[in-house]
Regions:
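N-terminal Rossmann-fold cofactor-binding loop
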Residues: 176-179, 208, 256
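A short acidic, Gly/Pro-enriched loop at the edge of an enzyme's catalytic core
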Residues: 197-205
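C-terminal hydrophobic helical "lid"/dimerization subdomain
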Residues: 1, 216, 260-314
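Glycine-rich phosphate-binding loop and adjacent beta-alpha segment
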Residues: 212-272, 310-314
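Mid-domain Rossmann-like dinucleotide-binding core that forms the NAD(H)/NADP(H) cofactor-binding site
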Residues: 123-196
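Glycine-rich beta-strand-centered segment in the early N-terminal region that forms part
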Residues: 22-38, 50-93, 122-124
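Short, well-ordered coil/turn residues at beta-beta hairpins
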Residues: 35, 90, 206-208, 310
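NAD(P)H dinucleotide-binding glycine-rich loop of Rossmann-like/cofactor-binding domains
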Residues: 80, 87-152
Length: 314
């Protein structure tokens, strides 16, 4: 059994290759992937070669942790899913010697049944956004967390963070965005250029820009006892001038990757209608054009979210 997969062979070297697919175990499901998302955070770092080293890191690798597909087969011990179910798959490790980091960008996947999440038919391609929504929710739902007064960055993660803040009953945040082309789609909240914002009393600032130099700018806008939440991923070391942080008794919190409970929580928000995933997927390519899709996803500022369509890939 084999599968067609996106393989990052090395920095800025990407191919669409046939790979051996491990045989499903009794507690696995086999999924025919319909769509997979391209992450402009994690996957950009893997593609560019800038991802910091961690256990299991190395090339070649299959990227992707945002896949939606249908269950083709279930193992003998699987009762949670049925053939034909539409599911969200947060990646897979089923390619033999080729690493899955995180292994979702392929036409077929073998995954433990407990790892996949059944989703409503109507979600369709928008289901790929559940991982990013869970990332935003994880930052918001931490013990003692304040909802953001200010969000830095109006990409997909920033938009989901703003939408979730409203969905969870918070006040409308302000959002900073330097790129004028991204100061749109702000239903219910204000998006401004940082230089046009005069406030210096924010209690809670969430950064999702990934800008390693954000701390001084953010701390300067905090109220006394305010908090900066680092919810992006930062390749370069972060630092800040101590005196302004000292004067404000500033706090800095780091939000890590989402957990299964976050994924289930955001799905409930979506299914109840409190959270919309509409208008966030802006670009699509057939999986056969993966090389073009990845370059556009990482190089075109008008591309908020790129997905690959695997349905017609031979």
């Amino acid at each position: 059994m084999d599968t067609l997969a996106v393989v990052i062979e090395g920095p800025e070297r990407l191919a669409l290759n046939r790979l051996s697919l491990q045989s499903p175990a009794s507690d696995d499901v086999l999924v025919d992937v319909e769509w997979s998302g391209i992450s402009t955070g994690t996957e950009r770092l893997l593609w560019s070669g800038r991802m910091p080293n961690f256990p299991g890191m190395g090339y070649p690798l299959v990227p992707g942790y945002e896949s939606v597909g249908r269950v083709r087969a279930v193992g003998s011990k699987v009762s949670s899913h049925r053939v034909g179910d539409r599911v969200f798959v947060p990646g897979a490790r089923c390619f033999g010697e080729v690493r899955g980091l995180f292994g979702g960008a392929a036409s077929q996947l073998v995954v433990p049944a407990q790892r996949v999440l059944g989703i409503d038919e109507s979600l369709a391609e928008r289901g790929v956004l559940l991982a990013l929504a869970a990332t935003a929710y994880h930052a918001l739902a931490a013990s003692g967390a304040r909802p953001p007064d200010l969000i830095v960055g109006h990409g997909v993660l920033g938009r989901l963070l703003a939408r979730l803040t409203l969905a969870m009953g918070g006040d409308a945040p302000t959002v900073w965005e330097r790129d004028a082309r991204r100061r749109d789609d702000s239903a219910g909240y204000l998006v401004v250029a940082p230089e046009d914002d005069t406030r210096r009393d924010y209690r809670s600032i969430y950064d999702v820009s990934g800008d390693a130099h954000i701390l001084d700018a953010a701390i300067a806008r905090l109220a006394m006892g305010g908090e900066v939440v680092l919810a992006g991923f930062y390749v370069e070391p972060l630092s800040f001038v101590f005196a302004p942080a000292f004067m404000r008794e500033a706090r800095i919190r780091i939000a890590a990757e989402w957990k299964d409970s976050d994924l289930h929580a955001v799905l409930e928000h979506v299914q109840s209608g409190r959270l919309s995933l509409d208008g966030l997927i802006t670009h699509r390519h057939d999986a056969d054009a993966a090389g073009t899709a990845y370059r556009q996803a990482f190089g075109d500022a008008d591309c908020l979210k790129m997905i690959l369509d695997w349905r017609y890939t031979a």
